[in-house]
């Protein structure tokens, strides 16, 4: 009875809208270097001791994706410093500002949204969101809040002239450095999630005017496709959903070795020796 009621609740698809939603979670954690380096188990009932490359509490979030080359090299350097601090029995200096991840139900920014910058030299200007970072609760706006920086660091050592370009800097959502634009009057506003009139889907509305702020199509872009309806399955490589959902495993009171022996037609005539536990 309770299960049927839960299944009738409207889904919250905005929680899953992320570029890496189809990437294996284990791969993303490895690029962040927040996985155990070694696990000391079999401690007679005591919890396992885990030695991390970088403890998840000490992870340094960024507006860049963790698998990008520059960010990955930064994570590798940080994990080496973290490990050397453990070997020398010293405290690891974090030297980073505290940033808390906003709850998924409160996050209302997606790539392609029209937003307005509230701080800096571009205060009051509007632009489109390029990328978002859920870990650091930051967004990058196309062509706004920029800073002049090197296009490729260390290029002069390779005999290439140093080139400069304007680079977009992240804007914090939790500090309200950037706000959504209300489609009613094109002024900055805050947004919230609420059920639509038929109570079967969550929509994003402005808290000031109550107008719906539609989710842009760019928010559905993932590593696998640009739009889910345009995705084409590759025969021989993509497993069809019908084959994935087909139930083929039948639980039996037998070990893995016994099941293999039955399939191969092997009969066991030997009598096992008694086993004693102390």
UniProtKB/Swiss-Prot annotation:
The keyword Glycosyltransferase appears for this protein: no
Alphabetic keyword roster: Mitochondrion, Ribonucleoprotein, Ribosomal protein, Transit peptide
GO molecular function: RNA binding; structural constituent of ribosome
Principal location listed in the UniProt entry: mitochondrion
Residue ranges constituting the KOW domain according to the UniProt record: 109-142
InterPro entries, alphabetized: KOW, Rib_uL2_dom2, Ribosomal_uL24, Ribosomal_uL24_CS, Ribosomal_uL24_KOW, Translation_prot_SH3-like_sf
PANTHER family membership: MITOCHONDRIAL RIBOSOMAL PROTEIN L24
Name of the molecule in the record: Large ribosomal subunit protein uL24m
Organism, as annotated: Caenorhabditis briggsae
Gene designation: mrpl-24
């Amino acid at each position: 009875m309770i299960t049927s009621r839960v299944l009738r609740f409207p889904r919250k698809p905005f929680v899953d809208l992320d570029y890496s939603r189809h990437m294996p979670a284990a791969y993303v954690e490895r690029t962040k270097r927040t996985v155990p380096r070694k696990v000391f188990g079999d401690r007679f009932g005591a919890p396992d001791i885990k030695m991390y490359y970088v403890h998840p509490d000490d992870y340094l979030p960024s507006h860049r994706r963790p698998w990008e080359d520059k960010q990955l090299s930064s994570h590798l350097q940080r994990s080496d410093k973290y490990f050397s601090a453990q070997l020398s029995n010293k405290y690891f200096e974090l030297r980073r500002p505290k940033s808390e991840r906003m709850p998924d139900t409160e996050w209302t920014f997606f790539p392609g949204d029209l937003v307005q910058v509230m701080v800096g030299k571009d205060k009051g200007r509007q632009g489109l969101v390029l990328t978002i970072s859920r870990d650091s609760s930051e967004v990058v706006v196309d062509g706004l809040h920029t800073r002049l920086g090197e296009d490729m660091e260390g290029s002069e050592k390779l005999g290439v002239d140093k080139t400069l370009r304007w680079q977009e800097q992240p804007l914090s959502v939790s500090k309200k450095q950037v706000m959504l634009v209300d489609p009613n009057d094109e002024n900055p506003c805050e947004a919230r999630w609420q059920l639509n009139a038929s109570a079967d889907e969550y929509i994003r509305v402005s808290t000031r005017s109550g107008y719906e702020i539609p989710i842009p199509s760019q928010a559905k872009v993932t590593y696998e496709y640009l739009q889910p309806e345009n995705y084409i399955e590759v025969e021989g490589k993509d497993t069809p959903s019908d084959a994935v959902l087909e139930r083929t495993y039948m639980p039996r009171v037998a070990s893995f070795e016994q099941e293999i022996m039955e399939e191969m037609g092997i009969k066991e005539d030997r009598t096992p020796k008694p086993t004693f536990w102390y």
